């Protein structure tokens, strides 16, 4: 029996599709990577009985990156990244072992059916899967077709079965367009980012950003936000005057009239008009009109409109809204959420989709009435040729989904029902009055038929007071006429919804990437999200955009990226050559990069005004080992130490607190040690600023603290404080934290394992002796007499933290947010876990602290 391998984009999709195609009769097991399951069943394929194996990937299998040495910022000129630096495809997540997993499942298979998402990224992943699987599949005989592509827009029985019955081929051109975009973004983004990050972080201490990134899409996105900020800053309010009149229609009722001139900017002229109208006692009716108008039902829903509404009405950021929509899609509640189309296909089953909502407690009455009276033909929208508009695929309740998932699903469903409803019809009445020489108007609206606003009440015509019945020549007494002084207002900061509209209009990003670009400028500290989800640029974001404008406006204007997007679309359509587009675009940006580097002084002048130089930033913390003067600690990201006398900057560990460590000095370079801590319940370790940046020994790497230093005799080093192999990771050593008392901690110097132990002990010391069972260093603990856990009022005990039954009761392991016993040999802590070499796979050395200090010294000095 032949075997058909089928691959979806996510594990949940694979399970849903397999259940539909197998009609529920399938067997499942976990794959070797633990993240993806394999679902097996028998059936027929190409007219013959076969065994189906349905599995998945977890998004992209591969990612594009530079070869090893080109990833070292200090050793490569960023200009080389445009052409000279070779790239390679690496596994997107090496921990998943996705390539090996696909090869294991694909070995010996005869056919492959690709169920990846039906967009350009999905096509690209198709070929990543094929690159892994085709070499291990059985060879085709006589030109037999073995590779198939399923195209679908929703996870419903009908759509999946139709896709299986109409298999096609993956689109190589669409995959190439994604390859081109990835390479362009990698080369251009890395070159500009590396240059400006190194240039400015070496000069200014309060940039508050660990990475000053540039992106071909990200930067124009930021440009829109800064452009609005500039308009606000340059806005000068103007005073204007308005006449407001009130007429009495009966004893208890009056009408407020709007001036036909709207406003004037000269007070004297406004005063003249006021004087002319103030004398009049009656307002004459000049004209009346009553017109029936309609408010159009919405177009079918596409991604951009969904993101706009999610931000403006639901308070959900674009990235979060997209993730929520993807979850609803994989669970089968909505159709594919990435689409540019706003027009339902001719064969779209509108009645069938509507019928699914007929019993919903919130909109059942509206749906039943539509089905009984006949649905209205949806408006003709734009057909982008990708996926149908976003629609609900099955009924769901608030209790079933909950939270943001329900709110987004509710909006999508209400929007769908509205597209097949009738327009909202209302009567607009207008009365024009003359008071002296001036004309005033009032208008009112009366709803005739709510139409689609019944299901989208927030779109309904606002209720207004009905106007009195009157005709030309009628007179009404004037209640009052007054002059109001007002001022013009500046525009507000862009909302996310407005930014999405601008990005779509100018062709910046795609429906899938727009949320990513907006999220990036927030994470890079270029903008902050204010109330009402408005995007306010930070000082750094403003200076960067102004700097780009000063040097080369095309770096921030949307025009050049829009042109690139058009070229990428031509690749996807097979109308442009991949290599030519790539080469031409890189050549353009390479020239721009060289000009940018030569003109960086222009941006630097703007930076000088907004940010402080390193020497003037920070507070004195620890002494430099070279000049013995105080170095300044710069807390803004990335935190670092700067010696203004030596003009040297030393990087520090991030995402924690830094403080002086007892004024102790490193025995190698005389720098004062500092202590890094992630909090009272997390890790902490001392480090020498110089050794952290310039490793003193061959087996040390940049960025290692004292807990990884192999100095044979320093009291802070791994040699003196190391205990034994980590209980979780393969390369780490558990090291005593000597600063943690009286709540003592032992932490791994590689992973985030922290063991809390010996609370309230006076002193904990790592002994030179080792355990006879596991070879870990013994700990000598001096307990508080009043709280000693030892029998017979003893206060001192030496033992192995892993094997000694006394110590086993006093140790608790913390790993990330979870808390569990450190010794897991059985249900209780007493049983131990059996350390030593048995746990480590063959060929892996067992890390432990060095024991023979003289041998270690000899190794370094020889």
From Swiss-Prot:
Basic residues: bias regions: 821-851
Domain Topo IA-type catalytic intervals: 171-593
Record domain Toprim: where: 3-153
Active site: 336
Name of the molecule in the record: DNA topoisomerase 3-beta-1
Function: Releases the supercoiling and torsional tension of DNA introduced during the DNA replication and transcription by transiently cleaving and rejoining one strand of the DNA duplex. Introduces a single-strand break via transesterification at a target site in duplex DNA. The scissile phosphodiester is attacked by the catalytic tyrosine of the enzyme, resulting in the formation of a DNA-(5'-phosphotyrosyl)-enzyme intermediate and the expulsion of a 3'-OH DNA strand. The free DNA strand than undergoes passage around the unbroken strand thus removing DNA supercoils.
A GO term, aspect molecular function: RNA topoisomerase activity
GO cellular component, one term: DNA topoisomerase III-beta-TDRD3 complex
């Amino acid at each position: 029996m032949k075997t058909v391998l089928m691959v979806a984009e996510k594990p949940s999709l694979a399970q849903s599709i397999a259940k539909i195609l197998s009609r529920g009769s399938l067997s499942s097991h976990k794959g070797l990577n633990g993240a993806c399951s394999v679902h097996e069943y028998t059936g027929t394929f190409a007219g013959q009985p076969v065994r189906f194996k349905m599995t998945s990937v977890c998004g992209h299998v591969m990612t594009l990156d530079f070869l090893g040495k080109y990833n070292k910022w200090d050793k490569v000129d960023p200009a080389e990244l445009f052409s000279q630096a070779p790239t390679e495809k690496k596994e997107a997540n090496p921990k998943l072992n996705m390539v090996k997993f696909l090869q294991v499942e694909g070995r010996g298979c005869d056919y492959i059916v690709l169920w990846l998402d039906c967009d350009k990224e999905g096509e690209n992943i198709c070929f990543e899967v094929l690159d892994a699987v085709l070499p291990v599949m059985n060879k085709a005989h006589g030109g037999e077709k073995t590779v198939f592509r399923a195209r679908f827009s929703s996870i419903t029985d009908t759509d999946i079965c139709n896709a299986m019955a109409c298999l096609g081929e993956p689109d190589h051109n669409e995959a190439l367009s994604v390859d081109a975009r990835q390479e362009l973004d990698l080369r251009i983004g890395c070159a500009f980012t590396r240059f400006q990050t190194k240039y400015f972080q070496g000069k200014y201490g309060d940039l508050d950003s660990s990475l000053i990134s540039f992106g071909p899409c990200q930067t124009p996105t930021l440009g829109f936000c800064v452009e609005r900020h500039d308009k606000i800053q340059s806005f000068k309010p103007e005073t204007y005057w308005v006449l407001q009149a009130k007429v009495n229609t009966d004893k208890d009722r009056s009408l407020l009239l709007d001036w036909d001139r709207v406003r004037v900017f000269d007070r004297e002229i406004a005063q003249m008009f006021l004087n002319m109208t103030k004398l009049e006692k009656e307002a004459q009716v000049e004209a009346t009109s009553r017109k029936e108008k309609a408010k159009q039902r919405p177009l079918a829903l596409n991604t951009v409109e969904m993101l706009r509404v999610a931000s403006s009405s639901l308070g959900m950021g674009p990235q979060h809204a997209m993730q929520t929509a993807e979850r609803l899609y994989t669970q089968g509640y909505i159709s594919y959420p990435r689409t540019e189309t706003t027009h339902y296909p001719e064969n779209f089953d509108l009645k069938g989709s509507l019928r699914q909502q007929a019993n919903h407690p919130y909109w059942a009455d509206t749906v039943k009435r539509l089905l009984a009276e006949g649905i209205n033909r949806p408006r003709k929208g734009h057909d982008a040729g990708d996926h149908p508009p976003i629609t609900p695929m099955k009924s769901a309740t608030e209790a079933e989904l909950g939270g943001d998932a329900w709110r987004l699903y509710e909006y999508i469903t209400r929007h769908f029902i509205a597209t097949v409803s009738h327009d909202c019809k209302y009567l607009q009445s207008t009365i024009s009055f003359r008071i002296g020489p001036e004309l005033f108007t009032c208008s009112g609206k009366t709803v005739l038929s709510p139409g689609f606003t019944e299901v989208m009440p927030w779109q309904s015509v606002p209720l207004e007071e009905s106007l009195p019945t009157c005709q030309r020549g009628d007179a009404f007494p004037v209640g009052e006429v007054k002059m109001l002084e007002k001022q013009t207002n500046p525009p507000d900061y862009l909302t996310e919804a407005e930014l999405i509209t601008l990005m779509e209009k100018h062709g910046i990003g795609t429906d899938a990437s727009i949320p990513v670009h907006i999220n990036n400028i927030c994470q890079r500290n270029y903008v902050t999200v204010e109330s009402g989800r408005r995007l306010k640029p930070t000082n750094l974001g403003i200076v960067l955009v102004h700097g780009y404008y000063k040097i080369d406006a095309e770096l921030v204007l949307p025009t050049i990226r829009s042109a690139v997007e058009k070229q990428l679309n031509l690749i996807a359509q097979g109308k442009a050559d991949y290599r030519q587009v790539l080469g031409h675009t890189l050549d353009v940006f390479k020239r721009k990069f060289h000009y940018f580097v030569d003109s960086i002084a222009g941006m630097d002048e703007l930076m000088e005004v907004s940010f402080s130089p390193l020497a003037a930033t920070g507070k004195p913390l620890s002494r430099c080992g070279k000049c013995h003067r105080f170095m300044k600690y710069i807390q803004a990201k990335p935190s670092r130490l700067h010696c203004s006398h030596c003009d040297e900057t030393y990087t520090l560990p991030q995402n924690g607190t830094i403080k002086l460590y007892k004024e102790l000095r490193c025995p190698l370079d005389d720098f004062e040690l500092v202590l890094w801590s992630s909090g009272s319940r997390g890790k902490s370790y001392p480090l020498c600023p110089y050794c952290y940046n310039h490793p003193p020994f061959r087996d040390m790497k940049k960025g290692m603290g004292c807990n990884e230093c192999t100095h044979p005799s320093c009291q802070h080093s791994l040699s003196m404080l190391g205990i034994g192999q980590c209980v979780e990771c393969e390369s780490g050593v558990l090291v005593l934290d000597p600063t943690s008392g009286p709540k003592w901690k032992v932490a791994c110097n590689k992973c985030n394992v922290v063991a809390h132990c010996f609370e309230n002990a006076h002193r904990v010391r790592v002994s030179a002796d080792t355990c006879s069972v596991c070879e870990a260093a013994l700990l000598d603990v001096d307990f508080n007499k009043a709280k000693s856990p030892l029998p017979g009022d003893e206060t001192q005990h030496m033992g192995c933290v892993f094997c000694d039954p006394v110590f086993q009761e006093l140790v608790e392991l913390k790993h990330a947010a979870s808390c569990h016993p450190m010794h897991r040999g059985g249900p209780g802590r007493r049983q131990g876990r059996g350390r030593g070499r048995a746990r480590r796979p063959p060929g892996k050395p067992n890390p432990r602290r060095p024991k023979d200090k003289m041998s270690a010294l000899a190794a370094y000095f020889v």
